[in-house]
């Protein structure tokens, strides 16, 4: 429960999307324990502020389907392997959260009894209300859908206030800022602008889903100091995507 000395929250329930690649840290593969522990501490701070936190993790640090696809492995098989990679990341994060005495539940779109709970919308909402972190794993459970789309879907289902996409850059740019020094960083974008400009925020399925349901997105640099705390208290960090420019 938030006490009177804590700042007023703009977002009470969030869905945080964290890429698998971000979990690698400076490595080329796997999970950097220091990144995992840092993420767990950031989440703990939000929970202690009274924020309800759901998460979706990517799996790109453990599995990339492109190489296997080029070798002849089918797309559906590759996508299923990617879903399992997200489960491995979810298990690692749950362990990191529990090491700092923060209760966490994993809910998987693919049943894996005895390891994680199956996804159940009403139970997920109950866990969130009880102060537990809920990690949604295995994407949507269907091939051809990205973890970005899964994040937006789960956010809508649980009634989150916003989807927060943590990246390695400080927002959305008109072009790759590493390749184009004239690239412009946007503070605000509409869903339509993202789609018409072909900006790499999320895949078009995820953007259209958010547009249809009025779910705002915020893209930010996870390495920015106190980024999550600043966002949930209403500070403009990174790029906000919504129906208009005054979300």
UniProtKB/Swiss-Prot annotation:
UMP binds at residues 59, 79, 140-147. It is found in: Cytoplasm. GO terms for molecular function: ATP binding; UMP kinase activity. Its EC number is 2.7.4.22. It holds the Pfam family AA_kinase. Inhibited by UTP. Pathway: Pyrimidine metabolism; CTP biosynthesis via de novo pathway; UDP from UMP (UMPK route): step 1/1. GO terms for biological process: 'de novo' CTP biosynthetic process; UDP biosynthetic process. Its main location: cytoplasm. ATP binds at residues 17-20, 60, 64, 167, 173, 176. It catalyses: UMP + ATP = UDP + ADP. Keywords: ATP-binding, Cytoplasm, Kinase, Nucleotide-binding, Pyrimidine biosynthesis, Transferase. PANTHER family: URIDYLATE KINASE (PTHR42833), URIDYLATE KINASE PUMPKIN, CHLOROPLASTIC (PTHR42833:SF4). Catalyzes the reversible phosphorylation of UMP to UDP. This is Uridylate kinase.
